[in-house]
C-alpha cells in the first residue's frame, strides 16, 4: 500500500492531468424538435480567453451542408471586428454586402461555456460538426496571419481581462 501511494498514485495523476486540453469541446447535443445544437466548451486554464466565430455545420441525408446560426452565448464588438477584417480581408463577413459581425465567445477561466445554434431544415440530420476557423492553422501563410491577428487583438486589449485563444482546438463530430 505504501508503494502505491508514493509511486503509482502520483504517476496516475500526472498521466491523467497531462491528457486534459487547455480548451476543449466538452459536449455537443442536437435537439431535432427545437432545431437547435447545444455546444459546451470547457476552459481548463487559469486564463480568460475568447474565441472567434465557432461554426456548427450540419449535414443532411442528401449530403446538403447547412450552417447553424449562433443564437446564445456570444457577444459582438465593432472594433474587434474591424481588426479581424484588417488581417483576414477575404473573410465573407468583411465584405461590404454583409451586415453581420464575427461572433465572440468569452471563456472565463476554469469554466464551461454553453453556446446554442439554431438551424432551419426539415430533412433528417446525419452529422453535426463544430469547427474553429480562427484556430490552429497548419500552413505557413495561415500561421503568419494568425500570429498577426493575435498580436493585434491582444495589444488592443479590446475585451478587458481576456485574450484571444489562437491555439488548435480539437473539433467534435456527432453522427446520428
What are these regions (language model features)?
Residues 1-26, 39:
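Bacterial Sec-dependent N-terminal signal peptides
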Residues 120-148:
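Short, surface-exposed ligand- or partner-binding patches at beta-edge/loop junctions that are enriched
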Residues 105-119:
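Short Pro-Gly-centered flexible turn/kink motifs
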Residues 142-176:
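Short beta-strand elements
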Amino acid at each position: 500500500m505504501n508503494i502505491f501511494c508514493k509511486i503509482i498514485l502520483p504517476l496516475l495523476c500526472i498521466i491523467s492531468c497531462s491528457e486534459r486540453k487547455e480548451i476543449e469541446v466538452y459536449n455537443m447535443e442536437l435537439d431535432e424538435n427545437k432545431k437547435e445544437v447545444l455546444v459546451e466548451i470547457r476552459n481548463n486554464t487559469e486564463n480568460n480567453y475568447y474565441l472567434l466565430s465557432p461554426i456548427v455545420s450540419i449535414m443532411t441525408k442528401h449530403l446538403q451542408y447547412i450552417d447553424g446560426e449562433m443564437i446564445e452565448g456570444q457577444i459582438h464588438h465593432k472594433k474587434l471586428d474591424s481588426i479581424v477584417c484588417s488581417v483576414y480581408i477575404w473573410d465573407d463577413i468583411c465584405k461590404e454586402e454583409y451586415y453581420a459581425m464575427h461572433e465572440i465567445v468569452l471563456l472565463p477561466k476554469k469554466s464551461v461555456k454553453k453556446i446554442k445554434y439554431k438551424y432551419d431544415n426539415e430533412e433528417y440530420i446525419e452529422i453535426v460538426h463544430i469547427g474553429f476557423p480562427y484556430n490552429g492553422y497548419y500552413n505557413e501563410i495561415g500561421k503568419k496571419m494568425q500570429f498577426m491577428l493575435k498580436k493585434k487583438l491582444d495589444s488592443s486589449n479590446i475585451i478587458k481581462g481576456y485574450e484571444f485563444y489562437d491555439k488548435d482546438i480539437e473539433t467534435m463530430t456527432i453522427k446520428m
